[in-house]
């Protein structure tokens, strides 16, 4: 099998303060057919400045994979249901092995 061919996919991450919030967001995205998959990992230790104060929080990261057609819809859905006042939203264009990339790109309804 030739694994040299690639397909473009989008990968985004956000973080939540609990595994329950991460599960809720992931399930909403999957059930809405907006993403092919979500992976939750954690706990992570996040350090940042928020409203002038240095903050140390335990968080869980959600990594989402989906097609470029759903880019705006995925971001809007996450920002709509996320419990944070200012959720992290980082989206990256990536290349995946062709068969996996095709699965990602064809899993979601448009």
Q: Where are the model-predicted features located?
A:
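Positively charged, small/polar-rich N-terminal and surface patches that mediate targeting and assembly
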Residues: 1-110
């Amino acid at each position: 099998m030739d694994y040299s061919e690639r397909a473009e996919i989008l990968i985004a991450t956000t973080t939540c303060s609990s595994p329950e919030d991460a599960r809720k967001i992931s399930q909403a995205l999957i059930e809405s057919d907006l993403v092919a998959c979500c992976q939750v990992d954690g706990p992570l230790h996040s350090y940042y400045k928020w409203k002038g104060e240095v903050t140390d929080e335990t968080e869980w990261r959600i990594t989402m994979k989906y097609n470029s057609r759903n880019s705006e819809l995925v971001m809007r859905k996450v920002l709509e249901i996320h419990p944070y006042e200012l959720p992290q939203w980082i989206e990256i264009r990536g290349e995946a092995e062709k068969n996996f990339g095709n699965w990602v790109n064809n899993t979601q309804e448009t």
